[in-house]
Amino acid sequence: ELRQGFADFYKNNFNVELNSNNEILPLMGSKEGIMHISLAFLNEGDEVLIPNPGYPTYASVTELVQAKAVYYNLKEENDWQPDFEALEKTDLSKVKLIWVSYPHMPTGANATLELNQKLIDFGKKHNILIVNDNPYSFVLNENPLSIFQIEGSKDIALELNSLSKTFNMAGWRVGMVSGNAILIDAILKVKSNMDSGMFYGIQKGAIAALKLGKDWFESQNEIYTKRRNLIFELAEKMNC
């Protein structure tokens, strides 16, 4: 039922079709998915492309599984997007996975369909798994995107999502990872040795949240916009 809730959410909000039986794996928060994915697909000595700046957990988990973090720089003049020309000049022979996160943390930069297409093309060319960490897609964002809106993306990509930011449910620890059945099965083999499932009451709450419509997102973003404007005013008064 929760898997179907996620599938309906993706269809309604991204126009993306996900098979609820084998292309969605609920998580106890998407953060654990970073560990599960790393354990499932990385071996000692493998390399991982990690954004700089970016979420610190990507690097710490990479080190935990004895893989090597290789940082790629995101710069304001490039709209905080990867420099694919620079990446192509990098030795990618040991790279197995690249972490991307848009809307980007900490800059807030948004993805575009063009960027997502470049990511998928890059992954396919070099046989690198693309993992899109997508928890902020509805926060101050008029055009939420999923990596799976790109044709053929399921061949080479996974996507993490979370109810923590979208529905203010951080303490509930509800997230998901989606992708093709083979990739999801590999992650499930790791996760099934970590826990025995999610409390049913939490699942029911998550299912109800996933059914909320645009009014919810609009009301939340109205609050966030007011808060952001206050921060801007404060920063200006402090000459920051």
Language-model features: locations:
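N-terminal small-domain helix-loop-helix segment of the aminotransferase-like
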Residues: 1-29, 36, 210-212, 230
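Short acidic capping loops at alpha-helix termini that bridge into adjacent secondary structure
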Residues: 17-24, 44-47, 94, 154-157
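Conserved PLP-anchoring active-site segment centered on the Schiff-base-forming lysine
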Residues: 40-62
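A short helix-loop-beta submotif of the ANL/AMP-binding
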Residues: 63-70
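Helix C-cap/helix->beta junction micro-motif
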Residues: 65, 125-126, 238
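Active-site phosphate-binding strand-loop segment of PLP-dependent enzymes
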Residues: 70, 74-142
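PLP-dependent aminotransferase class I/II
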Residues: 156-236, 240
